[in-house]
């Protein structure tokens, strides 16, 4: 199984940490790829940040489908 874990903010350090945590608990044979959008806020701390993160998040979800991930 291939899982694309999408951090909705653009902070790479957080994305890397999320990926490490997910890989630690993933079943054997599961590939976890952690990504963050190329556009959006560095953190999500309110409604405005949520709205600003949505376009980049949706772009990553669509890309995951095209890339053949089993789950995003």
Give short role names for the model-derived ranges:
Residues 54-72:
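Glycine/small-residue-rich loop that forms an oxyanion/phosphate-binding "nest" at active or ligand-binding sites
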Residues 1-58:
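N-terminal glycine-rich anion-binding loop in soluble enzyme alpha/beta folds
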């Amino acid at each position: 199984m291939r899982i694309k874990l999408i951090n909705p903010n653009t902070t790479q350090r957080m994305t890397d940490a999320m990926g490490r945590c997910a890989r630690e608990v993933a079943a054997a044979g599961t590939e976890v790829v952690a990504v963050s959008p190329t556009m959006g806020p560095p953190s999500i701390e309110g409604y405005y940040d949520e709205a600003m993160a949505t376009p980049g998040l949706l772009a990553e979800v669509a890309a995951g489908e095209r890339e053949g991930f089993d789950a995003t």
